[in-house]
């Protein structure tokens, strides 16, 4: 006999929409605005600042992924928090049927993250438009319930959050992704689709940052998830319970204070 465990997956837009709807049913207010800074009074964060107005809060949870790094640095907090730019092809709905998720047996992205977060690379992350280490390609394909595919992925360590990508570079990435997938799924590799990118945050030790900052009251972190759809749902509930006063020893290994730099706020 054999034990077959299929790898589960979710539709990110649908999952996020469902969480927002559940949040509002419980009485929460969902506002969409670009956060430009965190409001700080001495050693306490008291809210967030947007282009429109400031929103006061007794407790702020910074869950901004790759954008958390510049927001923290504006407060003088330096943490080994980085990001990759993930590139993929998204197709329209297709009559082809993929019976399982296809992905590399050995994922190169985690080795890339380790190389890019070495101590001698730290200064490069503070310079704009740098590529810290060469990109990697982990060939994969996944099909969603509406029939559309995501084909990936190339990971780049570009220091700028909005690094410009020319049409030529997009076409080159498209060709690389299709060429890597063609030996495995030739029909899928030729499906028409559009190039996309997104930012994926990670930390120097591979674990997310979950919990309060030891140097600033009123601010907790929930970022650095290199595999968010596995870890975010259970850890979000546990952080909420911890903020409500329920001690959770299981979060100790994820506390931002495990990094020495989290305990210093230079210039403040």
How does the language model describe each region?
Residues 2-59:
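Helical element adjacent to the flavin cofactor pocket in flavoenzyme catalytic cores
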Residues 11-12, 202, 231-232:
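Secondary-structure boundary/capping motif
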Residues 17, 21, 25, 73, ...:
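Short, well-ordered alpha-helices that flank and scaffold nucleotide-derived cofactor binding pockets
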Residues 18, 34, 176, 180, ...:
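Alpha-helical elements of Rossmann-like donor-binding domains used by nucleotide-donor carbohydrate transfer enzymes
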Residues 28, 42, 46, 213-268:
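C-terminal lid/capping helical subdomain adjacent to the catalytic/cofactor pocket in oxidative enzymes
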Residues 35, 193-194, 251-256:
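Beta-strand segments within the central parallel beta-sheet cores of soluble alpha/beta enzyme folds
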Residues 48, 55-67, 71, 236:
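Short hydrophobic core segments
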Residues 55, 66-195, 200-214:
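Active-site substrate-recognition segment that forms the wall
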């Amino acid at each position: 006999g054999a034990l077959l465990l299929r790898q589960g997956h979710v539709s990110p837009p649908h999952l996020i929409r469902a969480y927002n709807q559940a949040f509002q049913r419980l009485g929460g207010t969902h506002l969409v605005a670009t956060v430009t800074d965190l409001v700080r009074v001495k050693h306490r964060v008291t809210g967030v600042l947007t282009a429109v107005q400031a929103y006061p809060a007794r407790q702020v949870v910074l869950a901004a992924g790759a954008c958390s790094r510049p927001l923290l640095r504006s407060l003088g907090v330096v943490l080994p928090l980085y990001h990759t730019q993930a590139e993929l092809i998204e197709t329209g709905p297709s009559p082809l049927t993929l019976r399982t998720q296809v992905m590399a047996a050995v994922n190169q992205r985690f080795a890339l993250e380790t190389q890019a977060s070495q101590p001698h690379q730290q200064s490069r992350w503070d310079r704009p438009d740098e590529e810290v280490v060469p990109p990697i390609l982990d060939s994969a394909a996944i099909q969603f319930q509406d029939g559309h595919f995501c084909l990936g992925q190339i990971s780049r360590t570009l220091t700028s959050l909005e690094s410009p990508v020319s049409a030529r570079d997009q076409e080159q990435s498209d060709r690389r992704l299709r060429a890597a997938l063609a030996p495995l799924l030739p029909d899928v590799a030729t499906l028409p689709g559009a190039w996309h990118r997104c930012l994926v945050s990670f930390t120097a030790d591979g674990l997310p940052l979950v919990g309060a900052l030891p140097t600033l009251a009123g601010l907790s972190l929930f970022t650095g998830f290199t595999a968010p759809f596995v870890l975010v749902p259970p850890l979000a509930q546990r952080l909420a319970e911890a903020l409500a006063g329920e001690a959770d020893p299981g979060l100790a290994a994820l506390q931002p204070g495990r990094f020495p730099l989290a305990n210093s706020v230079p210039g403040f």
